[in-house]
Every structure is written in structure tokens, then in C-alpha cells.
């Protein structure tokens, strides 16, 4: 068995003492925070008590305005919008965020997720299937950046594809109608660690703002964003930390039938849902659908309209 050696970061002990005295933290906690680059009291406040009001606006996200213009046109012209997510939890929750929001904002949406048997990402066959359901726009979640064959097929069929993704951007032609990916060179948003569900949340919040529909509150979707962000193991810093902290509060309220049923089958009885419970009890069940069964089951659960349907789907999911 390989022996691992720990490398402990060296920290100025006088800085540890000063930070502990200024914040009331224990010296060990102050040392850990300093080793992670959190030295100012205001940084520590944001770390321990992140607030939604501290989310930076999507200014600088490449192609977000182009994506918004196309989605608004689709809603106004009553075009059918296809939503397609990858089969992991980030992809499924991205698809759920997009579907919930756009339906609430007046769109006709056909939601689909990838099948592991068909491989990762948007496929030519899926483009054809969504075209067969009269989709004129496709919005992807957690895939699409490098799916050149499928993007080419969509272009041939006159379908505009809005890609929401956070995977690395390969060299090659940009074939999507709009690409919202923090790793493209044109993107100027300061935080590059968002999961796709977080990017989807930003896009939908901006869409609601542009349409001026006050009856829909994007914050209601933060339970989904917390699930996808935690499951994808992205750094819980900056925007991710804010979204997850707020999302755990929404999840604890248990307002979504599908997640209420999932919490029941996971036998979580604590009043408050914590990040470790999401990571070890909830998201593995959702992931199992995509890895061992059909990820559409997980998406259907998240979109379930009532407790009766949600409990039936959660029971099926728990047996996968």
C-alpha cells in the first residue's frame, strides 16, 4: 500500500494570531483559512456567510446576450425549444433548471437527457429526434461545446443551438448559435469554476429579467443548482459557494415534489439538508439513473408536478 505524505502549508504565525484576534476564530481555523488565501475579515465573512446579493452579474459572459435574444424570439414566436442535458447530475439538473424556468416564462419546452448507451453529448440522432418534435431551438446543458457533428446537423436542419457548458473548448469552428462557456477565450466573467447548472441559472435569471415576468422567482430553482454543483465537485468558492449555500436552504424547505420524494427514499430525517448529505445520499441516486439505467428517469423526477408521481418515480430510481 502506497504511503502518502502530507505537505502542510507554511503560514506566518503572527498573521494567524492577528486574524484570530480580529475575528474571534480559533488559531487552527485561522491558520487553515490563511493557507487557503482567506486573510481579510471581509473574505472570511463571505466564506462563512455567503449572500445571494454578492453574486456578480453575468456581464462578460460571452454570447449570453445573443442567447437571450434568440430565446426571447422563440418565446414570442411560439417556437418549440428542445432542452438537452448530459446524463450526469450536472447535466440533468441543468436540463431541469432550463425546463422549469422557460416553461414558467411561457415557452413550449421538450426536455431530454443523454443516454449512456449513446455516448456523451449531443448526437446527430438526438438533433433529428428533437427536430421531429418541431424544435426550432435546442439548449444544451453540460455538453455541446465539442459536439461538432450534431451542431452541423442542427445547422443543416435550420435549428439554432445554444450551448451551456463548462468543459474545455477545443480548437475548431464555432458552430453553435451561441456558446456560453467560461473557458472560451472571449469570456470575461471573473469566476471560471461554475458548473453547467450554475451557468443555466444565470441565463434563466437574465431571461426572466429581460422578459420582466415578476411572477417567476429564479431563486426557487437553487435547490437544483445546489445538487448539480455539489455533484460535479467544482470548487465551493465564490459564485458556487453562494449558489450552494442558498440552494441548501431551498432544498431544506422541501418545496419541490421530486426532491421531497428523493429525500424520503434516502431516509434523510434531519430538518436541515447539508452538503455532505447531498453528496453522499441524494446525488448518487440521481447519478445511478444515468450510469446504470435511464437518466430520463432522474429528469422526470425533478420535473414531477405532484407528490403521487414523484413518489412513484423516486421508488423506481431507488431500485436502480
What are these model-derived regions, one by one?
Residues 139, 166, 173-174, 195:
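Phosphate/pyrophosphate-binding betaalpha-module
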Residues 132, 145-149, 169-173:
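Catalytic core of soluble alpha/beta enzymes
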Residues 2, 9-13, 18-134, 157, ...:
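Hydrophobic helix-and-loop "lid/oligomerization" segment in the mid-to-C-terminal part
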Residues 137, 141-160:
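Phosphate/diphosphate-binding loops
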Residues 83, 139, 162-163, 229:
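Residue-level marker for buried hydrophobic side chains located in beta-strands
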Residues 97-105, 156-161, 170, 176-183:
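A glycine- and small-aliphatic-rich helix-loop capping segment at beta-alpha/alpha-beta transitions
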Residues 11, 86-87, 114-117, 143-144, ...:
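Short, ordered loop/turn segments at secondary-structure junctions
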Residues 97, 174-213, 218-230:
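Short alpha-helices
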Amino acid at each position: 500500500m502506497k504511503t502518502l505524505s502530507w505537505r502542510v502549508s507554511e503560514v506566518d504565525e503572527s498573521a494567524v494570531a492577528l486574524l484570530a484576534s480580529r475575528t474571534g476564530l480559533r488559531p487552527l481555523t485561522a491558520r487553515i483559512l490563511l493557507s487557503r488565501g482567506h486573510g481579510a475579515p471581509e473574505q472570511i465573512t463571505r466564506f462563512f456567510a455567503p449572500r445571494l446579493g454578492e453574486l456578480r452579474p453575468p456581464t462578460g459572459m460571452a454570447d449570453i446576450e445573443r442567447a437571450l435574444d434568440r430565446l426571447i424570439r422563440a418565446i414570442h414566436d411560439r417556437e418549440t425549444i428542445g432542452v438537452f442535458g448530459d446524463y450526469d447530475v450536472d447535466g440533468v439538473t441543468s436540463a431541469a433548471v432550463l425546463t422549469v424556468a422557460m416553461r414558467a416564462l411561457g415557452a413550449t419546452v421538450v426536455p431530454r437527457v443523454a443516454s449512456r448507451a449513446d455516448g456523451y453529448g449531443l448526437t446527430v440522432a438526438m438533433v433529428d429526434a428533437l427536430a421531429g418534435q418541431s424544435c426550432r431551438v435546442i439548449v444544451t446543458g453540460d455538453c455541446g461545446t465539442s459536439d461538432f457533428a450534431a451542431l452541423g446537423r442542427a445547422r443543416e436542419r435550420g435549428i439554432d443551438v445554444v450551448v451551456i457548458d463548462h468543459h474545455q473548448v477545443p480548437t475548431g469552428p464555432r458552430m453553435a448559435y451561441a456558446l456560453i462557456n467560461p473557458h472560451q477565450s472571449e469570456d470575461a466573467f471573473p469566476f471560471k469554476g461554475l458548473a453547467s447548472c450554475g451557468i443555466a441559472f444565470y441565463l434563466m435569471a437574465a431571461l426572466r429579467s429581460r422578459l420582466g415576468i415578476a411572477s417567476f422567482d429564479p431563486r426557487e430553482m437553487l435547490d437544483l443548482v445546489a445538487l448539480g454543483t455539489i455533484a460535479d465537485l467544482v470548487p465551493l468558492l465564490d459564485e458556487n459557494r453562494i449558489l450552494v449555500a442558498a440552494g441548501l436552504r431551498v432544498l431544506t424547505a422541501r418545496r419541490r415534489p421530486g426532491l421531497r420524494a428523493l429525500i424520503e427514499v434516502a431516509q434523510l430525517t434531519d430538518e436541515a439538508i447539508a452538503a455532505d448529505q447531498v453528496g453522499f445520499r441524494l446525488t448518487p441516486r440521481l447519478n445511478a439513473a444515468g450510469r446504470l439505467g435511464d437518466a430520463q428517469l432522474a429528469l422526470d423526477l425533478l420535473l414531477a408536478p405532484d407528490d403521487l408521481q414523484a413518489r412513484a418515480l423516486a421508488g423506481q430510481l431507488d431500485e436502480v
